[in-house]
Amino acid sequence: MTILGSISSIGNVKSISKSNNLSSLSNSSSSLQSMNSIQCGGGCGNGGLLGAVGGLVGGVLTGTGVIVGSVLHGVGSILTGGPNNCGCN
């Protein structure tokens, strides 16, 4: 009786971890959209460096390599973004 209970509880843990992965994926897509707006807004007088640091912290907190890679790819343009980056949607 207890062995069957243990097996069923292990199955529940696997299903929970799968649902957490799906929610992480949906969170990463929304974070990538916000990251695009941060990259476009760099150099518009809103503190490009501050935006880069905020994006990095957000990527690390979500724990997905996709966001961290995207942030690292855009850090150079955020830090050196000129006024011609303003108004990007």
From Swiss-Prot:
Coiled-coil boundaries: none
- Family of this protein: Belongs to the hssA/B family.
PANTHER family, from UniProt?
HSSA/B-LIKE PROTEIN 17-RELATED (PTHR31857), HSSA_B-LIKE PROTEIN 17-RELATED (PTHR31857:SF2)
Q: What is this protein called?
A: HssA/B-like protein 20
Species, as recorded = Dictyostelium discoideum
Classification of source organism:
Eukaryota, Amoebozoa, Evosea, Eumycetozoa, Dictyostelia
